[in-house]
Amino acid sequence: MKVYYENDADLALLADKKIAVLGFGSQGHAHALNLKDSGMNVCVGLKENSASWVKAEKAGLMVEKTAEAVKWADIIMVLIPDQVQKAVYENDIAPNLKPGDTLAFGHGFNIHYKQIVPPANVNVIMIAPKSPGHLVRRTFVEGAGVPCLIAVHQNVDGKAKDIALAWAKGLGGTKAGVIETNFKDETETDLFGEQAVLCGGSAELIKAGFDTLVEGGYPAELAYFECMHELKLIVDLYYEGGLSRMNYSVSDTAEYGGMTRGPRIITDEVRQNMRQVLKEVQDGTFAKEFIDECNSGYKSMEALRKSNREHKIEGVGEKLRGMMSWLFKKNPKADAGV
């Protein structure tokens, strides 16, 4: 796998381009501000009544309605939620695309699942920082960057990959390393990771551990500390040095207990369920389910959100976090102005 760095990308490729960033949320604000600070000509495209309009203007950015921004631009980066991209594409982007334009995405969902099918006369690329937007911005301001993925779906002028690399450099990504992938692999691994490990698997593991201790007669506060609070300490060790760093850093008791009991939690049945989750990502089952859910007004999703909010661990956690003075600070998104 080739990793691209500073000398592999040329920002001059963007110097004479007009760049539209659609959206000013977590990723949108980082892309727009980093590219602007890298010397590029950037416009943010938003809905006319968007709450982000004033924020973008206060950040020193030119702001236009989405359709006008697309019409003006040579490169259009789509950084709005997956579920609204198709409608925005059909209403505001497609009618204003010009031959030779470059259409860019931060995630491959809508291209891979053919919710958006661009015309054959435009470049289609992806630049996906592997980090939340506030860290993309913060590391850039600090003179560094976060790793990025790039991909090319259509290359009409032979420059699509070079444009993607230049964009990644403008974000600061080439200081950390840029890896080339494709829309299929990025989309499917991203969705599987979210569902099986990061957002789905970890949340269910935490709740199951908490419930087991509480049902066993232990104080809910102790259950929270053991199954939720201390997880960050372990994840930080994974982040810094992998599984070996974690095993080296914990006690022998914890290491032995984890290695001998962990496989009894993640059983062959669990692994088979993971393979089924991956299959549903690969064959489009999940994508169709999610799109149908969005079109139905999020009825199931709202019920699931309510159930999560009402779980006992949430009330216990809120009380305990109120005792942790180091947590009394702004949300990272608020710090970043989004």
UniProtKB/Swiss-Prot annotation:
Top EC class of this enzyme: oxidoreductase
Catalytic activity: (2R)-2,3-dihydroxy-3-methylbutanoate + NADP(+) = (2S)-2-acetolactate + NADPH + H(+); (2R,3R)-2,3-dihydroxy-3-methylpentanoate + NADP(+) = (S)-2-ethyl-2-hydroxy-3-oxobutanoate + NADPH + H(+)
Domain (KARI C-terminal knotted): residue spans on this chain: 182-327
Signal peptide: none
GO molecular function, one term: magnesium ion binding
Pathway in which the depicted protein is active: Amino-acid biosynthesis; L-isoleucine biosynthesis; L-isoleucine from 2-oxobutanoate: step 2/4; Amino-acid biosynthesis; L-valine biosynthesis; L-valine from pyruvate: step 2/4
GO BP term (any one): L-valine biosynthetic process
Database matches in Pfam families: KARI_C, KARI_N
KARI N-terminal Rossmann domain segment(s): 1-181
Active site: 107
Residues annotated to bind Mg(2+) 2: 190, 226, 230
EC numbers for this chain: 1.1.1.86
Source domain of life: Bacteria
UniProt record similarity statement: Belongs to the ketol-acid reductoisomerase family.
Function recorded in the entry: Involved in the biosynthesis of branched-chain amino acids (BCAA). Catalyzes an alkyl-migration followed by a ketol-acid reduction of (S)-2-acetolactate (S2AL) to yield (R)-2,3-dihydroxy-isovalerate. In the isomerase reaction, S2AL is rearranged via a Mg-dependent methyl migration to produce 3-hydroxy-3-methyl-2-ketobutyrate (HMKB). In the reductase reaction, this 2-ketoacid undergoes a metal-dependent reduction by NADPH to yield (R)-2,3-dihydroxy-isovalerate.
Protein name: Ketol-acid reductoisomerase (NADP(+))
Gene expressing this chain: ilvC
